[in-house]
């Protein structure tokens, strides 16, 4: 008899891999994971266990008995309630008469937010004049309708020997805070896994998505017509898998930045002939930051230069070790263009789903996340929603982000009109008053009026929040957040000009340990700071450290928009010193660098006794005569110094604005080339 893997035996005997692994542990047989090989002796023992087991009562019988018990309980409760009603009323009336005679001081009072003097007096069973007198003795002049803060309320109540408890009231407008609360275990049912495909450019992400869709979705459909709604479902072995049709990092970054966790499993596509590339590393960082299981699909196995062993070797550096080498990462060789290995990949997704046990409660109002949204001339606002919990029905009042409405129509991923959508189901809906953003959370309600009120309140709150935007984690307020126990771990993204600098800086930063707060480096890379780095920092509340590199124009704009702290340095020990001082609360810089503009070198002229004159075009901001400058070539800083001359035509000028040409010479530097970026900056005093 040949050896067999755990998951193969489980499949053969119609049991889950997880149950089988539990059974093996009960039999004192150790297995590391579902890919472990089982010896013949173990297989025989398992056969005996499963063949001789006592018959269990059917699920239908259990359900019937349980239903009878529940019904009998409900009936008994009704009887009790009928008998109690009049008795309770009599007791209440008697208590009311007693209260007019004797007023007892309570042992404990509760409040939320604040109380007026009159409200506090009522809760303490005292006269308002008595409370006003006590406040006067404490040096507080107050009237009966004046609001009192938490400290004053506690001070007065303590004086009477009464305990005070503040109630934290969660507004319905902030439904995100309680929509992810766990349901009771008995209400949870198995749901399909939600999968995102990530990887480097041209490694076959889109081809893989198309290959899965064409082989599974269109089979058996009338005319084979599918509708692109940003997500689709496939059926494998009578089980469904939901794929987000957004290859790349969008499904992770923009959604995670808004607090939405959509993906259950990540498929990391790596070309067998190309190996690990920069965006592959970026994808790994995103998946790990989100805490999502990774399955590696080694693509392009049909190519002559394919070398899967090299891919495995390179990925071990990022803690993705194949099961064949003693790790726990699943590697599946595929050829997306020829459709080879697709079935095996889908089976592995089902296997991970089975082990992870993804569940949801279908018997409640729907909650979930927006995948895509747009404005259509004929239909109005269209939004693709992923139902994550509950069941969404046509006609349900719904709040999506700051918009609201009623679900007028729902269309599935295959273009069919549907009336209901359960957990992990993507649907396209119409009926919202505004276009929401990808990553916005949604919740269905029982009452349309209530949904409208909550939607309008959320829109108003978002407007107020936008005016007083709260910044992300920054070095200036780091110590305060540590003191308030808000920060136990500091997330950093490190970018440098060469790999050696990245490794040296990462190693030095990891050694910092102040006040029990650890440094966690969530991503490292070589080259300029990109928009993708800023979005990852925003989603993970991280600080970006740049060593000898600069952010590009898009990254700079996104950093300002997302309030991400970007720190740029040219000396390693200063980076370490700055982080350490910030963690100790000693960081107190007097000046802050402010980049005021960038100019691109379009042409160079060499003039005797003058040096190199750069004919430039100002592409962003402005260049001023008294600003410091740095020369950036291919995203790397190669020189830093001062302007020597700044001219428009033949005239010396104080500044040149955006979209104008100028002539620039730089002190003690003549090696200017076409395509170089001259970045101008000034040092501004920072108020503390």
From Swiss-Prot:
Region spans: Disordered: 62-103
Record region (G2): 224-228
Residue pairs linked by disulfide bridges in the UniProt entry: none
InterPro entries the UniProt entry points to: EF-G-like_DII, IF2_II, IF2_N, P-loop_NTPase, Small_GTP-bd, T_Tr_GTP-bd_dom, TF_IF2_bacterial-like, TIF_IF2
Residues annotated as transmembrane: none
PANTHER family associated with the record: TR-TYPE G DOMAIN-CONTAINING PROTEIN (PTHR43381:SF5), TRANSLATION INITIATION FACTOR IF-2-RELATED (PTHR43381)
Annotated ranges, domain tr-type G: 190-359
Function, as annotated: One of the essential components for the initiation of protein synthesis. Protects formylmethionyl-tRNA from spontaneous hydrolysis and promotes its binding to the 30S ribosomal subunits. Also involved in the hydrolysis of GTP during the formation of the 70S ribosomal complex.
Region (G3) residue spans: 245-248
Residue numbers binding GTP: 199-206, 245-249, 299-302
Originating organism: Bacillus cereus (strain G9842)
Protein name, entry field: Translation initiation factor IF-2
Gene Ontology cellular component terms for the protein in this record: cytosol
């Amino acid at each position: 008899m040949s050896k067999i893997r755990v998951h193969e035996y489980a499949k053969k005997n119609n049991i889950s891999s997880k149950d089988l692994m539990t059974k093996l542990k009960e039999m004192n047989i150790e297995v590391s994971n579902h890919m472990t090989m089982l010896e013949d002796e173990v297989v025989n023992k398992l056969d005996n266990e499963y063949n001789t087991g006592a018959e269990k009562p059917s699920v239908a019988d259990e359900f019937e008995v349980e239903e009878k018990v529940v019904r009998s309980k409900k009936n008994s409760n009704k009887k009790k309630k009928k008998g109690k009603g009049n008795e309770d009323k009599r007791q209440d009336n008697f208590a009311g008469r007693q209260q007019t005679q004797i007023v007892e001081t309570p042992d404990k009072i509760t409040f939320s937010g604040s109380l007026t003097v009159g409200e506090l007096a009522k809760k303490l069973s005292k006269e308002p004049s008595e409370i006003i007198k006590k406040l006067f003795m404490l040096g507080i002049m107050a009237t009966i309708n004046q609001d009192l803060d938490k400290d004053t309320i506690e001070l007065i109540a303590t004086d009477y020997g009464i305990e005070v408890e503040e109630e934290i009231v969660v507004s319905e407008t902030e439904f995100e805070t309680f929509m992810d609360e766990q349901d009771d275990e008995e209400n949870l049912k198995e749901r399909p896994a939600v999968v995102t495909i990530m990887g480097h450019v041209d490694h076959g992400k889109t081809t893989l998505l198309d290959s899965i869709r064409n082989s599974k979705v269109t089979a058996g459909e009338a005319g084979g017509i599918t509708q692109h709604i940003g997500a689709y479902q496939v059926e494998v072995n009578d089980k469904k898998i939901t794929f987000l049709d957004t290859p790349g990092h969008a499904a992770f970054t923009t959604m995670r930045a808004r607090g939405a966790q959509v993906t259950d499993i990540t498929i990391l596509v790596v070309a067998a002939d190309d190996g690990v590339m920069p965006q592959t590393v970026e994808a790994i960082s995103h998946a790990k930051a989100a805490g999502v299981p990774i399955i590696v699909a080694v693509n392009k196995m049909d190519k002559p230069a394919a070398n899967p062993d090299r891919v495995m070797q390179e990925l071990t550096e990022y803690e993705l070790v194949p099961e064949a080498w003693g790790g726990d990462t699943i590697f599946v060789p595929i050829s997306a263009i020829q459709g080879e290995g697709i079935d095996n990949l889908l089976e592995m997704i089902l296997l991970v789903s089975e082990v992870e046990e993804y569940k949801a409660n279908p018997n409640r109002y729907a909650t979930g996340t927006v995948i895509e949204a747009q404005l259509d001339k004929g239909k109005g606002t269209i939004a693709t929603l992923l139902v994550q919990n509950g069941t969404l029905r046509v006609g349900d009042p719904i709040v999506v982000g700051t918009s609201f409405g009623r679900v007028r129509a729902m269309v599935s991923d295959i273009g069919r009109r549907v009336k209901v959508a359960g957990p992990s189901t993507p649907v396209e809906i119409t009926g919202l008053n505004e276009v929401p953003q990808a990553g916005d959370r949604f919740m269905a309600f029982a009452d349309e009026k209530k949904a409208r009120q909550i939607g309008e309140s959320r829109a108003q709150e978002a407007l107020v929040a936008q005016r007083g935007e709260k910044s992300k984690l920054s070095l200036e307020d780091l110590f305060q957040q540590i003191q308030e126990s808000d920060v136990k771990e500091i997330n950093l993204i490190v970018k440098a000009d060469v790999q050696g600098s990245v490794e040296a800086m990462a190693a030095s930063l990891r050694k910092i340990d102040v006040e029990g707060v650890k440094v966690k480096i969530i991503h490292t890379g070589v080259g300029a700071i990109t928009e993708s780095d800023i979005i990852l920092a925003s989603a993970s509340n991280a600080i970006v450290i740049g060593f000898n590199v600069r952010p590009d124009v898009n990254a700079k704009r996104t950093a300002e928009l997302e309030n991400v702290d970007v720190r740029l340095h040219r000396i390693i020990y200063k980076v370490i010193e700055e982080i350490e001082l910030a963690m100790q609360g000693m960081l107190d810089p007097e000046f802050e660098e402010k980049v005021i503009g960038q100019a691109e070198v379009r042409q160079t002229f060499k003039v005797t006794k003058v040096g190199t004159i750069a004919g430039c075009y100002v592409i962003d901001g402005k260049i001023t005569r008294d600003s410091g400058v740095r020369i950036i070539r291919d995203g790397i800083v190669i020189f830093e110094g001062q302007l020597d001359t700044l001219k428009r035509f033949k005239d010396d000028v104080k500044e040149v604005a955006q979209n104008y040409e100028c002539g620039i010479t730089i002190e003690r530097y003549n090696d200017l080339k076409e395509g170089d970026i001259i970045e101008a900056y000034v040092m501004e005093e920072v108020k503390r």
